[in-house]
C-alpha cells in the first residue's frame, strides 16, 4: 500500500437490481504503481457465488491518483452492466469507499463496503 490507510483491499459493490454484487480488489496499478486500480475478483448472484462471471479479472477502476490516501481522482470506472467507461472519483470514509462515475458535471455513485 503506497499510503497507509488507503483504499487498498477488497470491496463489495452495492447490490444490483437482481440482488447480485461484485467484489473488487483495489491496489496499485500494474502499469504504474503510483496509481490505484481495481479488478473484479469475485461475483455473486442473489443465490451465491458466480465463478463463471464473464468479467472476472477485468479492470473496473483504472488510474486513480491520490495525494492523501482518502481522496482519489483522475481515473476512470467501467460499468460492466452497461459496458461504459466514466471519469471517476473516490472518497474513502473508514470502511466505506464512495465511488462515483461522472459524465460532464453529473455524477452517480455507490458506497462500496470493505470486505478485507
PLM feature spans:
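Sec/Tat signal peptide C-region and signal peptidase I cleavage site
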Residues: 1-6
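Central antiparallel beta-sheet cores of small beta-barrel/beta-sandwich binding domains
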Residues: 7-87
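Short, exposed beta-strand-loop hairpins at the edges of beta-sheets
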Residues: 79-90, 95-109
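Short, solvent-exposed mixed-charge patches
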Residues: 115-116
Amino acid at each position: 500500500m503506497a499510503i497507509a490507510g488507503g483504499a487498498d483491499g477488497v470491496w463489495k459493490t452495492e447490490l444490483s437490481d437482481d440482488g447480485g454484487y461484485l467484489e473488487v480488489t483495489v491496489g496499485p496499478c500494474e502499469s504504474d504503481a503510483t496509481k490505484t486500480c481495481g479488478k473484479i475478483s469475485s461475483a455473486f448472484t442473489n443465490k451465491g457465488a458466480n465463478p463463471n462471471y464473464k468479467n472476472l479479472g477485468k479492470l473496473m477502476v483504472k488510474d486513480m491518483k491520490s495525494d492523501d490516501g482518502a481522496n482519489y481522482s483522475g481515473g476512470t470506472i467501467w460499468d460492466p452492466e452497461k459496458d461504459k467507461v466514466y471519469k471517476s472519483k473516490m472518497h474513502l470514509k473508514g470502511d466505506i469507499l464512495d465511488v462515483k462515475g461522472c459524465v460532464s458535471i453529473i455524477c452517480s455513485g455507490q458506497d462500496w463496503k470493505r470486505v478485507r
